[in-house]
Amino acid sequence: RRRELPVTRKSCRNLFRVDRLVLGQAQVLDRENDMSSPQSLEDEQGGGDPPGDLRSVLVTSVLNLEPLDEDLFRGRHYWVPTTQRLFGGQIVGQALVAAAKSVNEDVHVHSLHCYFVRAGDPKVPVLYQVERTRTGASFSVRSVKAVQHGKPIFICQASFQKVQPSPVQHQFSMPRVPFPEELLDHEALIEQYLSDPNLQEKYRVGLNRIAAQEVPIEIKLVNPPTVSQLQNMEPRQMFWVRARGYIGEGDIKMHCCVAAYMSDYAFLGTALLPHRWQHQVHFMVSLDHSMWFHTPFRADHWMLYECESPWAGEYGGEWDQGTDFGVAESLLSWEIRPSSPFSLYTGGSRGLVHGRLWRRDGVLAVS
């Protein structure tokens, strides 16, 4: 039975809150498309549910793929960055949704490795082709290819595992930071920056551009820099992040897909923090993206995202015998214009970013 439930709209800028919500349209995907675990996820990370009963737009729209055939799905776009290229997190999240639909309910993703091979076209949908590489008793591997205009734009390998106990356990300690309730949200922080009369025009333009974007996630920066610190920043940052709206406890696979979406937002910019004052970024793209999932979590509850960039430079020179082992690593490339208008155009720079997603109870959930 359908009935309508009023939902208060917080602001005219928030496209993810609507005036009326038809509950019959907001239910979880039907049994054929449901990716939830048969057991409800015990919520240990705290923080409570977001207010209201509005289903997260990440579940109802962004990550709700249309099945076309067995192991073939179509995804549409919800938010397109100002670069007019497809958001990398959307492609990763949708690809993981497609892969997760091809495995049993009792197995969950533990790692994925992705390559972005072409720029995505925001004017057309994306087709996701799943190959069942291996289905074993404990582990299953799926290959996903995202296609536009008959050519792959993205390839991904995802590994799934049955939940099994482990006698060996350890982890780093979560950084000691203020809780999200003590911090300004993204919108309030931007307004604070814009109210400073000493803010340089290039920062003002960039902040206004960010403020105009409508994204289905919420962010609160930890120790946000002052205006005077913007020109002298290290390549590391931390912020609390969660999906807008409600996802629920039991859908473990969907929480992983939402985390894959969120993992690419504000992540790559970590490598540029020490350089923005000196160079104008022409464009920046992901080259590859890897994730490891360690423990159940809720992506609609606040999680601490710890990001750092240990290296940026150019490709070349002799190969070093050392090996770089990274966590939550993403390799990116960008082209830059030096701040001087008389300098030559340069490009080909690359950077590496590591990240960790912590539950607020101190458990390392994703890296």
What are these language model-derived features?
Residues 2-8:
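Extreme N-terminal basic, low-complexity initiation segments
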Residues 16-326, 332-338, 342-367:
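Terminal targeting signals and extreme-terminal segments of soluble enzymes
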